Amino acid sequence: MSKMEKRKDVRWSKVFLAAVTTAVLVIAGCSSHSGTNKDSSSTAYGTTANAVTQPANNTGDDNKSITVAIAADPGIDQLDAGAYKGSMNVHAMIYDGLVEYGEKGEILPALAESWEISEDGKVYTFHLRKGVKFSDGTDLNAAAVKFSFERWIKDPANSLNIATAMQSLEAVDDLTIRMTFNKAYYPFLTELSFARPVRIISPSAVEPAGDPNGTFVKAIGTGAWMAESYKTDQEAVLVRNPYYWGEKPKLSKIILKVIPDPQSRVLALQNGSVDLAGGQLGKIPVESLPVLQKDSTLSVQEAPGTNSHFLAFNGNNPVLQDVKVRQAINLAINKKSIVQDLMGGIGKEAKGLFPQTVPYVTEDNSTWYGFEPEQAKALLAKAGYSDTDGDGIVDKAGVPLTLNFVLQESEFPEWKSIGELIQSELKDIGINVKLQVLEPNAYYDTLWKTKDYDLIIYRTYDDAYNPHAFLLSLFHKTGDAPAVVWSDAKLEALIDKAVGTTDLKERQSAYDNIFKKMYQEAMFAAVYFPDDIFVVNNRVKNFKLGYTTFTPVFWNQLDVGE
């Protein structure tokens, strides 16, 4: 029998945001957590033999476990807290941050039980929780936090934007860490809740131990879980961290089973070889949901998401530098048909880059192009295109308008059918589209490195990453490198204004102008706002969706029963 659970909109706490402008902000309290070269051999991980005595309060049944389907190898051997390697979901299970993201987007205590922010927003002082240990039994202290931050800040490839503004990092005493910046940056606390690269790793996790420049050896965090074993491209086994400071997991073990093929994940759910699948862990094909909903052993959980799927344009292509062509592509896409006919009514038509579950996105600034194919044809004509040879494809100076459309389906199985529909719709207005389906690694190389595409379907980030982190990552230059999706100096100036002001009204105004400019210049093609779908075996008890995509499930609460 199918059960539908709706998650509340994830939004910023306006009270918290306004408080950033006050002289001092103190938040205190206790918060339970909710949460390379490879070979095919099995590798053992976990607490070492010479670790200190296991604590007595490690409660739970040592025989309780579940198996979770994941779409890609979790990369346990690369799971450095200070790097963008391995599974983001597993990062969040093994490592804790100083703070965590709450149900309504509020920032809650985690490893830091309280903190203060200076009046000018440039100095943050964090007070660490007492008695916290890493999974190897060593103590969490300010030196370990300093080590962790120095590890990711030193590497531009792994660093967040705020790293360039950090002037000093000081361990004031054993449980106090102070960070000083050369400018105010409102999203800093939110970024500290990210799964990576800001979470805290034990100094003994690298060689030589305690060296920020040391080589990563093993994932040692303060989180509720630690890696016990790992077989590349097959599975990873996570077990309870016996030293965990928060709510003790009810399960003793979580097995992450790598199943790249979406239909194979469906079969594994049906035959009981996996207990849970879905979301960013490993998408469930929409066309399989009716069958799964009728399965009496399974439950389907649905939640409104905070991301969107969209088409990125390659601005290096002279054809796509013409705003009329970009607008025509937008007007040719029937977003209602995508949601109703392809997605089975799951999700919503996109009205911009972000849904209104994202902070600063409002009804007023959510304006986008409708389905107007005749208007699209007229815009192509204004851009100088016509079908001179009667083959149904428009051309200009004898050159047909042909675009290469790149996608992948391992992580997002619906993208292939969406791509085929858009291909057909663009042909209807005279654009020839060639689809290219790539494996995930090749796909991401194409997006981030080679840019060997004209159109590529991608998704925004989720939850705490929106809107600022996604805009900085994809629509803003990094150093001398141009923006990944679309380069525009005026847009970048607006993004800088949004993230640099501590005034809430100024920030909202900056975001309004960002979204307006994106619409006017059709910097991308909006497609749809997906819902998150999970399928769970009914033997799994206490299932509850998490507040972020990197913690999609409250793992510590899960239990099993007959």
Regions found by a protein language model. Name each.
Residues A69-E119, E150, I220, T549:
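N-terminal lobe/hinge region of extracytoplasmic solute-binding protein
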Residues A18, L25, K231, E235, ...:
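Detector for C-terminal structural segments
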Residues E113-D155, R178, V319:
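Aromatic- and charge-enriched surface segment that lines or borders ligand/interaction sites
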Residues E349-T388, E409-W415:
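Structural transition elements
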Residues L169, E228-P242, I255-N317, K324-A328, ...:
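Extracellular/periplasmic solute-recognition and catalytic clefts
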Residues E116, N161-V206:
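Surface-exposed binding/hinge segments that line
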Residues E106, F194-P249, K253, P373-E374, ...:
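Gly/Pro-rich hinge or "lid" segments in bacterial periplasmic/extracellular proteins
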Residues M1-S65, E106-P109, N161, S168, ...:
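Short, low-complexity disordered leader/linker segments with a strong preference
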